[in-house]
């Protein structure tokens, strides 16, 4: 414990002393407050950089108090659950502080990299203290309980052998039913909390005029224009939206939109859809581990997973993306696949693919995985069980549900009879054929979409997202060819600190347990590689990583059941004197199940924009409650503007008020972006009758009427309406022709 406290103290001095390092945890305002509370001082060095000096003893006292309070609470919990002595309980808790040595290792590695001059390693370490801290805290939180649970489970298993088989079977069945029902209720409650929380955040951003039209509210305009006969488009697009993406999944919301035509509906549906992904995760984990409690913990990890939060609200506050709907459909498809329900799998995959054309880059490798798995299973077991028939994954034997019966004993689920040899042979061939067809389909669909369909809707122009890969060329053909023929350029862009950070951001919040099912996780590798090469956003704070999330949790739901088996295999490979304890497998299983949710929670503390993250409550953070969700006076002034613009008007408006005019006759973007509808010139379309400018939005470059482009270039064509908004908005009306 003492060593862990010292490690946290020494690394804490380094982090709190550097403005760039502490930015991974706190805003400058909160940093100033924390340094002051610790009796430290903030100043500048000779180069003008802001530094802080924090004394060793106050920080040591702070971490000692945290360790003492944590030890007391954990020991009390252990004694209540396991009827052990204070000494044994405190010993378990003391060992848990060994996880804090990770911060000492980070500090030592950072100093070593600096002394040696290994710049890439130093750069990586300077960018990752929050990841090391999240892992250290997660291990500290769950280690005492995992260790004691492993021992208790072994003891309970030994005692259980003295009971009669009939009694065991009856009590086991009853316990399983009660456990599953209770866990499912808890999952439902967690889903409800997520939906309420994120819907409230999204709606508050909308009412505060914080939601942009581009790449967010424009999708509601698609639905409005479609059922008003103006086509599947917004007027940001050069034509129909199919010239941007083969993305039609949000049309599933059209029946609801007919009843409630509002962007708020889309926000509610997106948050609900993302939250519902917890259901297949719960069921897959429960089946793979035999434990409803493990399923509950994995579902909690999913809902705490900070990359999921950024699918609901992106870092640039784009609050609705159709891409998010792929997450639940992929997860339900993976669950159906684990159950051997191929027809249902294909239907769900087709719906997920409608979220974006490049999600075929998930479907093609998934087909390879299905075919390869079926082929290897056929070779290993010529008479396999029916997929999912025994409640477990295809091709695997029965798994002892080691904690389905109040986390205590191991009851083996009986095998069912295998299929007749001919039937199983046909089943294997069918899965191999299905996998190969999926692979071919994925490749052909991507080629057809990107080389034929989308260019046709764009009038032959190149895809807009080719510019995200400008280092490889200016056209899709050049990009692909250079990736294939210039390996040095390709690997030079892939093997970077940025790629490692991206991988850490996806895997660390699930405690790396997804790596315990490497075949499933590999399904995401091709798309992950492409995302690492794009120059726009190579981190999971936008929407590009949406299809990676379901793959990570599919692999985690299955991989979490492999922890004990991995330890057993390791034990068999080691010499006798290096063997871990006999309880190591049970401890590893218990630890993995708890480490997942703890990792999601602690990483979210430093990286999530939700109320589970520090940034939400940090007064100096740009993502804080006080900056984004508190009352905004712009919202009070806007109704005065809206009342001046008739519904039949054709309106050009700035991005953050643009969503309020999408139900007018026409709704155009007012910016310096040159669009087809304005003849690719820096002006509004000719039929624009009103211009509305928000002078106080975050990116406004127009603060007063004298800066308005139209009043400078065409003052005789535009009339400036009287301002009754205290300068928050500028409204122009086109003068009648001839006046």
Regions found by a protein language model. Give the residues of each.
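Membrane-lumen/periplasm interface segments of specific transmembrane helices
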Residues: 3-15, 197, 201, 432-516, ...
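Extracytosolic helix-loop segments that constitute the early lumenal/periplasmic catalytic or substrate-binding loops
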Residues: 217-241, 248-249
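Perimembrane helix-loop-helix junctions
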Residues: 160, 362-386, 397-411, 424-443
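Signature aromatic-anchored transmembrane alpha helix within multi-pass, membrane-resident enzymes
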Residues: 92-98, 185-192, 439-443, 563-613
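Hydrophobic/aromatic-rich transmembrane helices and adjacent perimembrane loops
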Residues: 118-136, 361, 521-571
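Specific aromatic-rich, kink-prone transmembrane helix
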Residues: 280, 316, 322-348, 373, ...
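Transmembrane-helix signature of polytopic, membrane-embedded enzymes
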Residues: 272-309, 327-328, 342-347, 593
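Start-transfer (signal-anchor) and selected internal transmembrane alpha helices
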Residues: 1-3, 64-69, 77-99, 119-155, ...
């Amino acid at each position: 414990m003492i060593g862990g406290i010292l490690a946290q103290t020494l690394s804490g001095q380094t982090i709190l002393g550097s403005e760039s390092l502490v930015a991974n945890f706190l805003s400058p305002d909160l940093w100033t407050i924390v340094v002051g509370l610790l009796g430290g001082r903030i100043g500048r060095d000779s180069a003008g950089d802001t530094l802080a000096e924090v004394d060793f003893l106050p920080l040591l006292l702070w971490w000692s108090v945290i360790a003492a309070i944590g030890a007391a609470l954990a020991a009390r919990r252990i004694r209540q659950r396991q009827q052990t002595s204070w000494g044994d309980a405190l010993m378990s808790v003391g060992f848990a502080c060994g996880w804090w040595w990770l911060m000492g290792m980070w500090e030592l590695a950072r100093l070593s990299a600096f002394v040696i001059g290994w710049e890439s390693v130093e750069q990586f370490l300077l960018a990752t203290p929050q990841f090391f801290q999240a892992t250290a805290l997660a291990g500290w939180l769950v280690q005492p309980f995992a260790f004691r649970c492993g021992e208790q489970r072994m003891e309970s298993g030994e005692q259980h052998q003295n009971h009669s088989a009939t009694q065991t079977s009856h009590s086991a069945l009853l316990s399983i039913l009660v456990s599953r029902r209770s866990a499912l209720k808890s999952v439902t409650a967690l889903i409800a909390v997520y939906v309420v929380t994120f819907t409230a955040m999204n709606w508050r951003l909308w009412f505060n005029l914080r939601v942009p039209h581009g790449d967010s509210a424009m999708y509601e305009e698609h639905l409005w224009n479609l059922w008003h006969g103006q086509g599947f488009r917004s007027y940001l697009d050069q034509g129909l939206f199919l010239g941007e993406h083969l993305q039609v999944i949000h049309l599933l919301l059209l029946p609801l939109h007919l009843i409630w035509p509002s962007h708020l509906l889309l926000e509610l549906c997106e948050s609900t859809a993302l939250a519902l992904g917890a259901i297949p995760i719960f069921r897959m984990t429960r089946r793979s581990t035999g434990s409803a409690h493990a399923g509950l913990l994995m579902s909690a990890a999913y809902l705490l997973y900070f990359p999921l939060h950024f699918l609901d609200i992106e870092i640039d506050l784009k609050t609705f993306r159709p891409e998010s709907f792929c997450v639940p459909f992929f997860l339900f498809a993976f669950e159906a696949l684990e159950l051997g329900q191929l027809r249902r799998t294909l239907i769900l995959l087709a719906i997920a693919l409608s979220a974006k054309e490049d999600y075929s880059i998930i479907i093609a490798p998934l087909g390879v995985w299905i075919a390869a798995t079926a082929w290897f299973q056929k070779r290993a077991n010529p008479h396999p069980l029916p997929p999912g028939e025994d409640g477990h994954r295809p091709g695997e034997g029965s798994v002892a549900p080691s904690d389905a019966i109040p986390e205590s004993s191991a009851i083996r689920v009986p095998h069912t009879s295998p299929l007749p040899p001919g039937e199983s042979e046909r089943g294997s061939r069918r899965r191999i054929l299905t996998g190969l067809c999926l692979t071919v389909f994925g490749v052909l669909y991507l080629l057809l979409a990107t080389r034929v369909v989308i260019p046709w809707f764009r009038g032959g122009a190149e895809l807009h997202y080719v510019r995200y890969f400008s280092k490889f060329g200016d056209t899709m053909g050049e990009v692909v060819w250079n990736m294939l023929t210039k390996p040095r350029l390709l690997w030079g862009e892939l093997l970077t600190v940025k790629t490692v950070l991206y991988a850490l951001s996806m895997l660390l919040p699930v405690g790396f347990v997804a790596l315990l099912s490497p075949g499933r996780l590999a399904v995401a590798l091709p798309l992950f590689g492409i995302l690492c090469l794009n120059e726009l956003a190579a981190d999971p704070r936008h929407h590009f990583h949406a299809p990676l999330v379901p793959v990570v949790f599919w692999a985690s739901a299955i991989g979490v059941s492999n922890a004990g088996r991995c330890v057993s295999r390791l034990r068999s490979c080691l010499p006798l004197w290096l063997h871990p304890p006999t309880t190591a497998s049970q401890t590893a299983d218990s630890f993995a199940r708890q480490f997942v949710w703890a990792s999601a929670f602690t990483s979210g503390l430093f990286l999530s924009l939700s109320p589970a993250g520090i940034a939400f409550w940090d007064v100096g953070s740009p993502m804080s409650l006080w900056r984004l969700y508190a009352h905004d006076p712009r919202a009070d002034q806007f109704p005065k503007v809206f009342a001046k613009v008739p519904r039949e008007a054709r309106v050009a408006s700035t991005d953050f008020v643009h969503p309020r005019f999408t139900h007018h006759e026409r709704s155009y973007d007012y910016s310096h972006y040159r669009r087809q509808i304005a003849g690719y010139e820096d002006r509004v379309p000719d039929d624009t009758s009103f211009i509305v400018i928000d002078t106080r939005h975050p990116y406004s470059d127009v603060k007063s009427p004298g800066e308005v482009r139209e009043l400078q270039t065409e003052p005789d064509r535009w009339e400036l309406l009287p301002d009754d908004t205290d300068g928050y908005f500028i409204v122009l009306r086109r003068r009648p022709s001839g006046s």
